[in-house]
Regions:
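Glycine-rich Rossmann-fold phosphate-binding loop(s) that bind the pyrophosphate
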Residues: 8
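N-terminal Rossmann-fold NAD(P) dinucleotide-binding loop
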Residues: 12-13
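NAD(P)-binding Rossmann-fold cofactor-contacting core
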Residues: 22-48
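Rossmann-fold NAD(P) dinucleotide-binding segment
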Residues: 58-95
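Rossmann-fold NAD(P)-binding glycine/threonine-rich loop
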Residues: 78-88, 95-124, 129-132
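Rossmann-like NAD(P)H-binding beta-loop-alpha module
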Residues: 112-179, 185-190, 197
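Substrate-binding/catalytic subdomain of NAD(P)-dependent oxidoreductase enzymes
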Residues: 158, 169-265, 270
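ATP-dependent carboxylate/acyl-activation modules
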Residues: 262-317
């Protein structure tokens, strides 16, 4: 099977190394993985990838590929590359929640056909998209709450220790946790992208990103954090989806939760999701929600599903 990779940042490099490391799982199903090429911006840059892999700044190798793994990030450029490829009835594996959330007008038909695999788009290697697209469909969805952004988790944890917001944010940026500018994270938009993706499995298969009400953590003060602590509570940036009249209400906002709440006890560096259904009851998912190798593990898992003949993650119709 010939595979193409778009992007060679941390995630792209880890995908390539994990495919090599886990070669035996592909051998077990009788498949030999050949990397046709890796699309990059700078071919001269040093990278931690297996020897012998073609690195290029052109997309001509896509014609050879049975499946493409997209790790570029962004919206316009990956869509420009992937749309013609998807039109040729071939499959794409991606972790790109912004692309999925914002350009569903283009991508939905390919997802409905089973040609989009995107487990890693929400909570990275902690599996939530797979269960939502399969086993949880048997249960009537009622509500979800989730903490989905590691940068906000880090900043709020530092503020609990007495650091001002600006200082905690600067540290997060210095450590590489937050982008510069960090609005996508601290403004709640990264979380809103992920909530939009999940909503299409449990509420409305055409749920629009524009329907999410978004408020970030920029306005929180040490006084807010301390007042919550005195009352046995913590602030978290919470994504929430629940029934509202005949439709659905989706929000992202800072919320005070009891310290014993599952979203608080999951750990400062972990994502968490509380999923509620009439028949399945309350389910809790928790684990790493960011990082190169954990994201790569979900993407390589999607590759294995593709090779085994399983369809991609099909939303509600």
């Amino acid at each position: 099977m010939t595979v193409g990779v778009l992007g060679s940042g941390t995630v792209g490099q880890d995908v390539l190394n994990l495919i090599q490391k886990r070669k035996h799982i592909f051998d077990d199903i009788g498949v030999n993985i050949e990397i046709a090429g890796v699309l990059v911006r700078d071919v001269q840059k040093k990278r931690n990838i297996p020897d012998g892999i073609r690195v290029t700044d052109t997309c001509d190798f896509l014609q050879e590929c049975g499946v493409v793994i997209e790790t570029m990030g962004g919206v316009d450029r990956p869509l420009e590359i992937l749309h013609p490829y998807l039109r040729s009835h071939r499959s794409v594996i991606t972790a790109n929640k912004a692309l999925l959330a914002e350009r569903w007008d283009v991508l939905r038909e390919y997802a409905l056909d089973g040609n989009l695999y995107y487990e890693a788009s929400v909570m990275a290697g902690t599996p939530v998209i797979g269960p939502m697209s399969t086993v949880l469909r048997a249960s009537t969805f009622t509500r979800l709450q989730a903490v989905l952004n590691g940068t906000c988790n880090y900043i709020l944890t530092q503020m609990e220790g007495g650091k001002e917001y600006a200082q905690a944010l600067a540290e997060a940026q210095a450590l590489g946790y937050a982008e510069d500018p960090p609005t996508l994270d601290v403004g709640g938009f990264d979380t809103a992208h992920k909530l939009t993706v999940m909503a299409r499995f449990c509420a409305d298969g055409n749920f629009p990103y524009s329907a999410v009400e978004v408020q970030g953590i920029e306005g929180l003060t040490l006084a807010d954090i301390e007042d919550a602590r005195k009352n046995g509570e913590k602030y978290k940036l919470v994504a929430e989806l629940e029934r509202h009249g005949s439709g659905w209400k989706a929000t992202v906002a800072p919320k005070r939760l009891p310290e014993t709440h599952a979203l608080c006890t999951a750990g400062a560096s972990r994502n968490a999701l509380v999923y509620e259904g009439e028949e399945c009851g309350t389910l809790i998912f928790a684990g790493g929600g960011a990082g190169g190798m954990i994201t790569a593990s979900a993407m390589v898992g999607d590759l294995l599903d593709y090779l085994l003949g399983f369809p991609g993650h099909v939303p509600l119709h």
